[in-house]
Design a protein with these regions (language model features):
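Alpha-helical cap/lid subdomain in secreted, periplasmic
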Residues: 2-149, 153, 159-167
Length: 167
């Protein structure tokens, strides 16, 4: 709320939000966390700011978290990311699935992608996260073209509503 209040007098062209990991580790209720994100995105978009959200990363990649807790946090991370996607898209923002794009790198080379505390990303991990959202951020600002218009849907394939596609 404090950061958002500072932006009200001079809304930025673009806001990039990385969110979710602390909500999982602090056991914040998903409805509360997503509701807060929804309000922030709504306010920013309403002020003319393009919003790109890097959704909750896969905390199942954090190796100091033992099994079976690692499986539980992986599932909670993915469920929160799906709910974040629905809320952000409904409010006019864009999302980037950090879990889908980065989890395999963090799992394959944890010593490279995690910092000394083995929880937070290293400089390389943060650089990969920034690179993951960059195309969407550039497109939101009109610096890159939007993805080409898709051909008409194949009637033999079902299109899913955003809530099902995000899951």
């Amino acid at each position: 709320p404090t950061q958002l209040a500072k932006l009200r007098s001079h809304p930025p062209d673009l806001a990039v939000i990385f969110i979710g990991a602390n909500d999982i580790i602090r056991r914040r209720r998903p409805a509360e966390a997503v509701g807060h994100l929804r309000e922030v995105v709504r306010e920013l978009v309403g002020a003319g700011t393009a919003v790109v959200v890097g959704t909750c990363p896969d905390l199942g990649t954090v190796q100091p978290i033992g099994r079976p807790l690692r499986t539980i946090v992986r599932r909670a991370s993915r469920q929160l990311a799906a709910a974040q996607t629905i809320a952000v898209v409904e409010e006019g923002g864009r999302t980037v699935s950090l879990s889908d794009l980065l989890a395999s790198d963090f799992l394959a080379q944890p010593e490279e992608f995690f910092g000394p505390d083995r929880f937070h990303p290293s400089a390389k991990g943060y650089a990969y996260a920034a690179a993951a959202v960059l195309p969407s951020a550039c497109a939101a600002l009109g610096l890159l073209p939007e993805p080409a218009e898709q051909p008409a849907a194949d009637p033999s394939q079902d299109l899913l509503p955003v809530d099902q596609a995000a899951a």
